[in-house]
């Protein structure tokens, strides 16, 4: 029973038998808490339950929660691999009571589990309690038989938990195990409590107060329980090891790393193996929960974790991408407990493979840049922190790698300046991700739902229905009536209007009654099943309790249905063409068009898009019925139905099946599953696939790293789009005097010819600007013993000025070139180049600044051998060159 998977099952089964609902782990991306970057505790998904604004169908629960601590206040990243218990990813086992049982039962349940089920010796156990919590101390004496020496009173915040400045709070009791005198350290509360001998493994939080304001606490009428046990710590205890990395799960991962790099762990490399094993877990679970590597927010943290692991693979001698080859081992070890890991295996592997390939290029590029930036630094000097951070932030070159690369030369890094730049980046990252999850739902909806109940949705079967108004809102506050000319929100007992969700926009239409007409401009869902209609009252008055008729805009709903069904066909066609790693990451299903985002690491070419469109239309032409069926969620997944990222599913789900399997040519074939597409979906769909009419893919684009966006049209809109394209193509053929089939080739030839002529023209202008191909005897004058070539050039692009300056320096051999380029709109660009032998005497930056003011510019920048500036006043070109000549004469 000491394996990680067995321990998890024992914990959950124990509390299930004690009447707790077993609640699946929530996503690592918090859905209702914009203050958190990642889910970092078991209670996060129950926060609204603890505060009383949300009710669940159970009053006590248990879970094994996925947690990540690698950003924000809870950041263990830099310690991972170098200590026995720090992780970026870990599982928190917990049991929770929402006003059901309290201290006595919580302590009794915990004691029975650890001593009877887990078999821990009571003699090795001890606890801490909050200094003022006499009740908890008495319960430990009674239930566990502990003496006062084994009940340690702690008066600090370590044993008093608060959700925030206000809200539920209460004392804690932590359970410790004495691992024996062979390990250093003293009991909790002693000066050497940070040693390894006494290990805390379970924290029981007794939420019995509400913090009203600083210094003011009230007792809660129904106190609650929140506990958290680290699964990895408990596994180490039960397996008799003193490091989490020596448990069965981590041993399997570390063995996989050793096999992949063909190198056995040694004491000097142990930290690298641990880093890779830990980061593989956090990386894989974050990708499975929809986070992809990027340069901001959660994706920024993910990329940092990934690249830290990849850096350690590099230290172990890996020269090709390796990390993706470790994913199957992780899925084998944890995929049964977390099915999302197995479902996302292809995406995780491909994302890791591509990211590691990019990182290896980053290493090469970063080392080259580092060499350039430190050419003038001697041993004992420091590289600037800003430069080190630019290497890290722009090029993904880690600080530790920069330090390692410079260590052999005796060069350090200004880490204070680096930390300051990092702080600015973290603040920018926090601004990017804060609120990117679902905003915390307004409490007003909880009150309405408690009073009116959930809205019954009738829209699968009808587009019109009678209903009774249960609530009205205007400007966010409940009202009794809405009058003509007023805008507001209507909540009814039932509705045919679809509420925006799953990417499908909400319905529009009308609400009517005797002397009443209101226009519904949109429909949303709150709290999962409370439908809210945004309305403008055009005639009469809407009143709470009134009976009304709700009618959906039929034409708009029909277009939305067609587009939603088309997304299912396109999604499956994309998987068939691109691979099983493709997963939908978001969508917009509107009446005019559809778009959806998929996980795919590179652009989708025209040939692939064409095949996708052909496959989807081939299935459409089957005109097969679209079948919907209600099933248990586990049964649906086992049957092959695809669950979409970001969607929440209840115990019972709606499964939508479409079409018969086809091959890449659109021919019907026998498939592994009976249908072409099977997805969990709560949206509205066509009855027969033929109702879609036609699917036209408009194109694809990048949304972020590893995410592509597909846009398409259906039905009449698709036909009109194709007709417009056809007319445009015919017009092009007429202008080119070529058959339609030859238009691409003719256009390509013309474009290449234009490029050739433009290059010839640009080269000719450069030669004219610099005095012809042969140069000239009078092209430079001598000032203060130095040759100066100073010239105003016209008809030359600003980007070409540097090239001309380099050409001038070559002609001179030794000297200075000053060029002013004046554009057609009168703006000017100034470039000064100094040959290498003169850079000790003259600085191109100073010379540029001498002339820039005459062009209306400020300053200038560059290096000693080449600098540039610009300004709005090209009329000052001659004066600028004269000023440079004067500066040269002044020495």
Curated annotation (Swiss-Prot):
Main subcellular location: cytoplasm
Gene3D superfamilies per record: 2.40.30.130, 3.10.310.40, 3.30.54.20, 6.10.250.550, Bira Bifunctional Protein, Domain 2, Threonyl-trna Synthetase, Chain A, domain 2
Pfam families: DHHA1, tRNA-synt_2c, tRNA_SAD
GO BP annotations, alphabetical order: alanyl-tRNA aminoacylation; negative regulation of DNA-templated transcription
SUPFAM superfamilies: Class II aaRS and biotin synthetases, Putative anticodon-binding domain of alanyl-tRNA synthetase (AlaRS), ThrRS/AlaRS common domain, Translation proteins
Record note on cofactor: Binds 1 zinc ion per subunit.
This enzyme's EC code(s): 6.1.1.7
Swiss-Prot/TrEMBL catalytic activity: tRNA(Ala) + L-alanine + ATP = L-alanyl-tRNA(Ala) + AMP + diphosphate
GO molecular function, one term: alanine-tRNA ligase activity
Compartments where located: Cytoplasm
Alphabetical UniProt keywords: Aminoacyl-tRNA synthetase, ATP-binding, Cytoplasm, Ligase, Metal-binding, Nucleotide-binding, Protein biosynthesis, RNA-binding, tRNA-binding, Zinc
Superkingdom, natural source: Bacteria
Entries under InterPro entries matching the protein: aa-tRNA-synth_II/BPL/LPL, Ala-tRNA-lgiase_IIc, Ala-tRNA-ligase_IIc_anticod-bd, Ala-tRNA-synth_IIc_core, Ala-tRNA-synth_IIc_N, Ala-tRNA_ligase, Ala_tRNA_ligase_euk/bac, DHHA1_dom
Record's keyword annotation contains Nuclease: no
Cofactor field: Zn(2+)
The keyword tRNA-binding is assigned to this record: yes
Residues annotated as binding Zn(2+): 564, 568, 681, 685
Family: Belongs to the class-II aminoacyl-tRNA synthetase family.
UniProt function note: Catalyzes the attachment of alanine to tRNA(Ala) in a two-step reaction: alanine is first activated by ATP to form Ala-AMP and then transferred to the acceptor end of tRNA(Ala). Also edits incorrectly charged Ser-tRNA(Ala) and Gly-tRNA(Ala) via its editing domain.
PANTHER family: ALANINE--TRNA LIGASE, CYTOPLASMIC, ALANYL-TRNA SYNTHETASE
Comment text on domains: Consists of three domains; the N-terminal catalytic domain, the editing domain and the C-terminal C-Ala domain. The editing domain removes incorrectly charged amino acids, while the C-Ala domain, along with tRNA(Ala), serves as a bridge to cooperatively bring together the editing and aminoacylation centers thus stimulating deacylation of misacylated tRNAs.
Protein name, per record: Alanine--tRNA ligase
Organism: Methylorubrum extorquens (strain PA1) (Methylobacterium extorquens)
This protein's encoding gene: alaS
């Amino acid at each position: 029973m000491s394996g990680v998977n067995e321990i998890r099952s024992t914990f959950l089964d124990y509390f299930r038998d004690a009447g707790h609902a077993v609640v699946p782990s929530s996503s690592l991306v918090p859905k209702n808490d914009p203050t958190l970057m990642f889910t970092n505790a078991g209670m996060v998904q129950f926060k609204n339950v603890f505060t009383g604004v949300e009710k669940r169908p159970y009053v006590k629960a248990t879970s094994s929660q996925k947690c990540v601590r690698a950003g924000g206040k809870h950041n263990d990243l830099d310690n991972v691999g170098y200590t026995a218990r720090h992780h970026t990813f870990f599982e928190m086992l917990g049991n929770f009571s929402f006003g059901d049982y309290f201290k006595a039962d919580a302590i009794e349940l915990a004691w029975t589990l650890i001593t009877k089920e887990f078999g821990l010796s009571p003699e090795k156990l001890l606890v801490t309690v909050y200094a003022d919590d006499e009740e908890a101390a008495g319960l430990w004496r009674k239930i566990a038989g502990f003496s006062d020496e084994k009940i340690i009173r702690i008066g600090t915040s370590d044993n008093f938990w608060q959700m925030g400045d206000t809200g539920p709070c209460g004392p804690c009791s932590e359970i410790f195990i004495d691992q024996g005198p062979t390990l250093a350290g003293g009991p909790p509360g002693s000066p050497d409590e940070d040693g390894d001998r006494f290990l805390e493994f379970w924290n029981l939080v007794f939420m019995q107060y509400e913090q009203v304001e600083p210094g003011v606490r009230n007792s809660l009428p129904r106190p609650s329980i929140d506990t958290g046990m680290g699964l990895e710590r408990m596994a180490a205890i039960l397996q008799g090891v003193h490091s989490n990395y020596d448990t069965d799960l981590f041993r399997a991962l570390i063995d996989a790393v050793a096999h992949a790099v063909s190198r056995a762990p040694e004491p000097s490399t142990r930290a690298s193996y641990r880093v890779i094993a830990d980061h593989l877990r956090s990386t894989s679970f974050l990708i499975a929960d929809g986070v992809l590597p990027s340069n901001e927010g959660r994706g920024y943290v993910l990329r940092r974790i990934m690249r830290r692991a990849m850096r350690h693979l590099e230290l172990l001698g890996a020269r090709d991408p390796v990390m993706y080859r470790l994913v199957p081992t992780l899925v084998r070890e944890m995929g049964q407990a977390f099915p999302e890991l197995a479902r996302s295996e292809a995406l995780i592997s491909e994302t890791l493979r591509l990211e590691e390939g990019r990182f290896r290029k980053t290493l090469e590029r970063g080392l080259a840049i580092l060499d350039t930036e430190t050419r003038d630094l001697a041993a004992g000097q420091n590289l600037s922190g800003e430069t080190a951070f630019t290497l890290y932030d722009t090029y993904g070159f880690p600080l530790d790698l920069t330090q390692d690369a410079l260590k052999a030369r005796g060069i350090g890094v200004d880490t204070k300046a680096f930390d300051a730049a990092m702080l600015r980046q973290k603040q920018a990252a926090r601004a990017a991700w804060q609120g990117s999850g679902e905003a915390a739902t307004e409490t007003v909806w909880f009150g309405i739902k408690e009073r009116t109940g959930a809205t019954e949705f009738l829209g699968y079967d009808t587009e019109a229905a009678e209903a009774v108004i249960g609530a009205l809102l205007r400007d966010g506050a409940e009202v009794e009536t809405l009058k003509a000319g007023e805008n507001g929100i209507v909540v009814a007992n039932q509705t045919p209007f679809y509420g925006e969700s799953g990417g499908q926009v909400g319905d529009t239409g009308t609400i009517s009654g005797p002397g009443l007409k209101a226009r519904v401009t949109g429909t949303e869902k709150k709290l999962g099943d409370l439908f809210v209609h945004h309305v403008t009252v055009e005639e009469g008055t809407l009143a709470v309790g009134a009976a009304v008729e709700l009618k959906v805009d039929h034409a708009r709903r029909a277009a939305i249905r067609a587009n939603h069904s088309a997304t299912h066909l396109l999604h499956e066609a994309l998987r068939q063409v691109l691979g099983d790693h493709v997963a939908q990451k978001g969508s917009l299903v509107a009446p005019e068009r559809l778009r959806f985002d998929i996980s795919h690491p590179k652009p989708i070419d025209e040939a692939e898009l064409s095949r996708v469109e052909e496959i989807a239309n081939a299935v459409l032409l089957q005109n097969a019925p679209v079948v919907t069926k209600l099933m248990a969620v586990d049964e649906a997944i086992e049957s092959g139905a695809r669950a979409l990222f970001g969607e929440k599913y209840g115990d019972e789900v709606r499964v939508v099946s479409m079409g018969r399997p086809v091959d890449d040519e659109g021919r019907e074939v026998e498939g592994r599953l009976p249908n072409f597409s099977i997805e969990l979906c709560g949206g509205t769909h066509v009855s027969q696939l033929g109702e879609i009419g036609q699917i036209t893919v408009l194109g694809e684009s990048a949304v972020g790293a590893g995410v592509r966006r597909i846009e398409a049209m259906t039905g009449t809109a698709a036909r009109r789009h194709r007709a417009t394209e056809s007319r445009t193509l015919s017009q092009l053929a007429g202008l080119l005097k070529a058959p339609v089939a030859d238009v691409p080739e003719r256009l390509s030839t013309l474009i290449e010819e234009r490029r050739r002529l433009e290059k010839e023209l640009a080269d000719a202008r450069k030669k004219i600007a610099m005095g012809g191909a042969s140069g000239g005897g009078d092209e430079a004058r001598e000032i203060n013993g130095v040759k100066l070539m100073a010239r105003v050039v016209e008809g030359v692009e600003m980007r070409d000025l540097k090239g001309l300056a380099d050409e001038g320096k070559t002609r001179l051999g030794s000297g200075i070139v000053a060029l002013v380029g004046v554009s057609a709109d009168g703006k000017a660009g100034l470039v000064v180049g100094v040959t290498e032998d003169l850079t000790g005497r003259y600085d191109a930056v100073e010379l540029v600044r001498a002339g820039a003011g005459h062009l209306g510019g400020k300053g200038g920048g560059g290096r000693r051998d080449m600098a540039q500036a610009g300004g709005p006043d090209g009329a000052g070109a001659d004066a600028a060159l004269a000023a440079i000549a004067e500066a040269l004469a002044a020495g």
